[in-house]
């Protein structure tokens, strides 16, 4: 793991708007920070057919995701558009303090990062803040587990966070047994030491070997 970065791992980035989250991360997301959103977990149809409209300042996607950061007084909020020249995409990443991986599909996110030559670039980033939602949070991990039709699959991620393995969108009433199975599988198949269930109203802050729970997080 790159211990020089700080990682905020969420199930739902809307939690950033919650007072509980704000109190937990306000000393990390500092005023005048510059944020770049990498939306590559979205469907290809959305990315390649609607991005010009949705990612502009007046677009619904832009407004929805910028809203998460408004109370932190960030100075700039960019979204990487797949139609951007690669040099401009890399400039946005280099120029910003915060890399925000929005949610969607893990495999699409990995495919797009590799297709645009960003997989290795992101792995080399140091001294930045990563905020990752759902699919983004899973892909940051060394390894992650997903369930499809109640069948578990282990997948490889970016290997930027190698001490936690998270179960996203956890609902205590619905997922208690599944999380128990998840923990057993994680202990057997993944190298991460700590396993957490993160609800839509919770998140983890990972700084080196220090893990801080914010909101509704279970272990």
Model feature map: region roles:
Residues 1-94, 98-107, 192-197, 201-219:
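Extended, subdomain-level signal for the structured scaffold at the beginning of enzyme domains
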């Amino acid at each position: 793991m790159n211990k020089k970065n700080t990682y905020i791992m969420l199930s739902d980035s809307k939690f950033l708007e919650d007072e509980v989250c704000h109190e937990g991360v306000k000393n990390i997301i500092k005023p005048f920070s510059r944020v770049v959103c990498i939306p590559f977990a979205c469907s290809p149809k959305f990315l390649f057919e609607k991005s010009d409209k949705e990612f502009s300042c007046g677009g619904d996607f832009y407004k929805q995701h910028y809203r998460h950061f408004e109370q932190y007084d960030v100075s700039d909020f960019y979204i990487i558009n797949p139609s951007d020249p690669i040099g401009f995409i890399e400039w946005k990443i280099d120029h910003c303090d915060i890399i925000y991986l929005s949610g969607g599909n893990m495999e699409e996110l990995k495919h797009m990062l590799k297709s645009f030559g960003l997989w290795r670039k992101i792995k080399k980033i140091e001294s930045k803040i990563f905020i990752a939602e759902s699919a983004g949070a899973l892909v940051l991990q060394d390894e992650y587990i997903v369930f499809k039709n109640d069948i578990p699959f282990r997948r490889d991620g970016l290997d930027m966070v190698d001490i936690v393995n998270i179960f996203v969108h956890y609902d205590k009433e619905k997922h208690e047994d599944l999380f128990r199975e998840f923990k057993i599988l994680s202990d057997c198949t993944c190298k991460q030491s700590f396993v957490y269930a993160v609800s839509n109203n919770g998140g983890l802050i990972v700084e080196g070997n220090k893990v801080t729970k914010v909101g509704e997080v279970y272990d």
